[in-house]
Regions:
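His/Asp/Glu-rich metal-coordinating catalytic cores
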Residues: 1, 6-188, 194-199
C-alpha cells in the first residue's frame, strides 16, 4: 500500500512481485490513490474551517499509476537473479491471489545464507487457492505471526453453516449484509453462493 509513497519520495528501482500481485496492483493502487486524495480533501475542509494549513495526500492516483511502470511480475517457483550475490524465489503462500513466501539467497564475504520471509499463510483445502508451498530450510525466518500462538479448530462444515444463515435470513424476509475484504474473502463468499445455486439447494 505504501509503494506509491516510495515512488513519490524518489524510488525508481524495479519492484519485483508475483504476476498476480502485479495484475491486482494495476487496479488497486490507483484506486488507493483516489481514496488518499478524497480523504485529504475531507480532512482539509475541516482544517481550513479551524484555520489550519491544508495537508497533502500521502500519494495521489497519478503517482500510484506511475509507480506501476516499475513493477516486474514474476512466476512462482522461479529463481530470479537480482545481482551476482542475491537471488530470490516467490513461493505460493496460499493466503490470497498473488501472495507469496519469499526465499532470499545472499552471498556475502564468501558465505551463503538463506532468508525466508512470509506474511500470512493460507490453509489447506481452500477453494480457489493453492495450498501453501512448504519451505524446508532457512538460516533466518521472518514471518507474520498474529495467530501463531493459537490453535484453530478445524470447521469442515463452515460453508454449510454460512449457507444456513443466508437461507434462514432470506426465508424470514431479511437482508444479508456481509462485510468483507475486496480481495480474497469476497471471492470465497461468491464461490460458495454460486456453488449452492448450481447445486439447486434451498
Amino acid at each position: 500500500g505504501r509503494i506509491p509513497k516510495l515512488y513519490k519520495d524518489g524510488y525508481r528501482n524495479p519492484i519485483y512481485t508475483t504476476n498476480a500481485t502485479c495484475d491486482l496492483c494495476a487496479i488497486m493502487l490507483p484506486d488507493s490513490g483516489h481514496i488518499q486524495e478524497t480523504e485529504a480533501e475531507w480532512k482539509n475542509r475541516k482544517r481550513i474551517r479551524r484555520g489550519e494549513l491544508p495537508i497533502d495526500p500521502i500519494y495521489d492516483a497519478e503517482t500510484a499509476a506511475k509507480c506501476l511502470e516499475l513493477f516486474k511480475g514474476e512466476p512462482y517457483d522461479q529463481i530470479i537473479e537480482l545481482d551476482d550475490n542475491i537471488h530470490v524465489r516467490f513461493n505460493d503462500a496460499g493466503h490470497m491471489l498473488g501472495s507469496s513466501t519469499i526465499e532470499i539467497w545472499i552471498k556475502e564475504n564468501g558465505e551463503n545464507k538463506k532468508i525466508v520471509f512470509s506474511g500470512d499463510l493460507g490453509n489447506n483445502d481452500i477453494p480457489l487457492l493453492s495450498e501453501p508451498t512448504m519451505i524446508e530450510d532457512a538460516d533466518f525466518l521472518v514471518m507474520e505471526s498474529t495467530y501463531g500462538n493459537r490453535k484453530h479448530i478445524r470447521n469442515d462444515n463452515k460453508a454449510e453453516l454460512f449457507i444456513d444463515i443466508v437461507t434462514d435470513t432470506l426465508k424470514k424476509g431479511g437482508i444479508v449484509v456481509i462485510p468483507s475484504f475486496a480481495v480474497g474473502r469476497t471471492q470465497e463468499i461468491l464461490y460458495e453462493l454460486n456453488r449452492i445455486k448450481d447445486s439447486n439447494l434451498d
